Amino acid sequence: MIKVVYVTGCFGFIGSYVTRACLEKGWYVRGIDKCTYASNEDLLFEFTEKYGDRFTFEREDINDLQFLYDCDYVINTAAETHVGNSIVSSKEFVKSNVDGVHNLLELIKNHRGENTEKPVLIHFSTDEVYGDIESGDHTEKDILKPSNPYSATKAAADMLVMAWGRTHKVPYMIIRPTNNYGVGQYVEKLIPKSVKYLRIGKKIPLHNNGMPLRNWLHAADTAEAVMTIIEKGSVGEIYNVAGGFEQRNIDTVEAIVKSYFKGNQKPTEEYIDFSIGRPGQDIRYALDDSKLRSLGWKPTKVFIEEVEAIVEYYKYKFIW
């Protein structure tokens, strides 16, 4: 069945993959993006050229959005996401990640009228809301223990969503993915930043000696997870999404270095600046996503097979 959806943050990394997945299904998408430094506005041409009038765009901050057209889903990927920036200055994170979500909830609450089932809010959260875990995996029922300003704002937004669901009967589903990777990510994130530093001949800054463990999930698999919960998920539920591939950050950088130099590299440590620390650094994130997998979803992308294409993209095609 053809659906009409809003995607906030449609020109962001994950938002663009979600937008593309919706359009590929033949759905109508109204994209919302305030076009920050991390947005890729070139996507407007791609979406309109390839999908025609099934994609419409509104340049707007979700805090300032005052009206919703009739739709089936509001998929909220709009957010400030870079942990380092949140540590330096948290104001924009509170504004986008908390106040912006509050405005969306109010819009949905007031828009629904007698139609109590639509639109459904699909809210993007993060694995970071749980805090770190030395062993085992976090389930959706675990308490939230965010460790930095970014994850604290995302946890606060989750609480707002659940409260509006209970008090105002706003239908919602929350999705909590692990670290995403793929072509199109802004250069402040580990993988594209590593390529950038190799390209300009600078050492790659790596926190805590590169020992923190991260679970990697391709953005295309994340977008497919959204499609799965739309088609088979239940309103009022939270869904963890994990890539099933875990490794230390230093191992991720080593894979990038090997791909960049095609095997002709010096020892990986010679390309890394280990002097950088990060306050509140989480040692390990890990999620149990059996709930989502029971709906038939599973990741299809293999990290090591994707690295070469990603490195080549950032090496030659990305405008720094």
Which residue ranges define each predicted feature?
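N-terminal Rossmann-like NAD(P)+-binding domain of SDR-like oxidoreductases, especially those catalyzing
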Residues: M1-N180, A309, Y316
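Short alpha-helical segment that forms part of, or immediately flanks, the ligand-binding pocket
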Residues: K91, V195, R214
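Short beta-loop-alpha junction of Rossmann-like oxidoreductase domains
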Residues: D132-E134, V183-Q185, K189, K291
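Hydrophobic alpha-helix immediately C-terminal to the catalytic Tyr-X-X-X-Lys motif of short-chain
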Residues: A156, L160, W164, S194, ...
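Residue-level signal for the nucleotide or nucleotide-sugar donor/cofactor binding architecture
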Residues: N63, V88, S96-D99, N148, ...
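C-terminal substrate-binding subdomain of Rossmann-fold SDR/epimerase-dehydratase oxidoreductases
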Residues: E24, T56, L198-W320
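A glycine/serine/threonine-rich, flexible loop-to-helix segment
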Residues: G136, V187-V195, I256
